[in-house]
Amino acid sequence: LWSFWHSVLGLIVMTKAKKWGKNINGVMMVVNFVQVCLATMIVGLYIFDFKLGSSPFILLRHEMTWPILSRPDYLQFVKDGTGLNTTLQNYWMVIHPPVLFLGFASTTIPFAFAVAGLLKKENNWMDSVLPWATFSAGILGLGIMMGDAWAYESLNFGGYWAWDPVENASLVPWLVLVAGIHTCLIYRKKGTSLKATYLFFGLSFLLVLYSTFLTRSGILGDTSVHAFTDLGMNAQLLGYLLIFVIPYFGLLIYRLKDLKEPQEEDEISSREFWMLVGSLVLFLSAVVIIAITSIPVFNKIFGTKIAPPEDPAFAHNQVQIFVAIIIGILTAIGQYLKFKATSAENFIKNIKWPLIVTAVLSAIIFYFIGIAYEEKGIGYLGALYVGVVAATFGIVANAFYWFNILKGKLKSAAASVGHIGFTMVLLGILISSSNKTVLSWNTTGISPLKEDNAKNNPTGNPRENITLFEGVETDMGKYMVTYQRDTLDGLDKRFFELNFKEKKSDHSFLLYPDVLKNNKMEGFSANPSSKHYWNKDIFVYVTSFQDHSEEDTTSFKPHQIAIGDSIFYSNGTIKLDNVLINPNPKAASSSNELVLQMTVTSKEGLKYEAKPGILLEGMTLNQELDTVKAQNLVLSFNKVV
């Protein structure tokens, strides 16, 4: 996929020969060399004892030594593969990988321009590279968000972002690339930040290669839930990385003396000063992320035993929240500053109304939505509040700049529109990640999960799972939920129909979570169902269920009880109130019936009536069971002693 997109981009680059002039030669040299290196990954040739690549077309009998493969008709004994993991059977996984790999492939073009510029000692490529760099950042960002959408819908990581090393591997190149775009803009206007632009455009591609090494080498096996295992190509992957890293940095250091920039210092009130600050903040953010992600690499190289953070998400969040605050503010004020210098009077005049509107909107957000995240202390909670204000400021200030300063001209508003989109995403992340609420708190004291599920399943916390019985309305937070029925389709996917009814109104809706039979015959995999509102989403998924296709092995636990006595069960007591003799007047005269009149009382004080009995008809004795579905109880009258 990477090689395919690389070929497509290479063909497009070739059409720019007349426009780019001599620059095209250096760019195509790098693009072609990258393509050759990619091609070696799928060659599958042995050079002495070294295997170069792994061919996707190799036959099973050429790779394995199983005796059955010596038979000419061995294919009739080979069954189809198990296919995709059930969690990957999602429409987002059809479009996410192609878009993401297009983003990876596109980082080659800015890198190729940087290499060509260093080789030729020319810096006139900045105008040509900018559209490619913005395209690359846009596509790579889109691919990342598609992956987030998949994680959000499938709830594989408890949300759309979990700071998993494989997620970080795509985010870090994007951060550095965006930093490079901003320093490139500075160079075009002022002739400064040239060295930083070379560094950032080079690193964006090299970090893609490093990310490939991390995810494909198996080194992240203990820290990532969806990294690949060792594919037997570690030496080649490392060589692929070093063959670009060493020459590029060697060439960059060698050419530093030729990268001339004006010696004058930027004014603190200038746009270029704060653009550079923002670029450096993005770069430092990337450094922190990749450093934490690379802990297994450091341990491997230096023989250390540095432990990864116990709470990886918070280890990143406690740093990145301040990055979000700074970037939110800089995207807001940056365009109100002029290149070279800005008068304080003019700046205050332009920024005054955006600040006022931001204060009003922030107050509305805090009042109607709020932030309910106190797990990490008041300091982090305060940072979240500031982050929401900063993101709101970014949206409002850029909207004001677009309509007041640019008079609503879309052609001139690329930066404003981009910043509005980015800060809207930032605001959504801060609000949604800070307001996760569990509706299904289990207050019964009965865990619906097996012990191994409760410990190992990230969605298997017993306190966050309640048992629903068919046809029984159950309290769940702001809603009363009824499990109405379930259906099974032809692909072994079982859908559960759940009716949610708001307690304070008559509003109700249906959700259909499903479970899909695991293709390795190891149980089921859950897919959530969701209800989307403008300000919230409600997710529901099935952690476990009673498979009616299997034999019920539940056994009764006998108890001896007298009238007025009570016995305990896991969630309360069962009292025998009375014994009724032939309570049914319409019963046949030849039959005799005994019915136990019992009261089931739960820990919550809820009472249920139960009437198990025995019926003697002629010489046949029948047991009459009674079920208390809300308490998962089945009562049987066995005998009189």
Regions found by a protein language model. Give the residues of each.
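Solvent-exposed, non-transmembrane regions of integral membrane proteins
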Residues: L1-V641
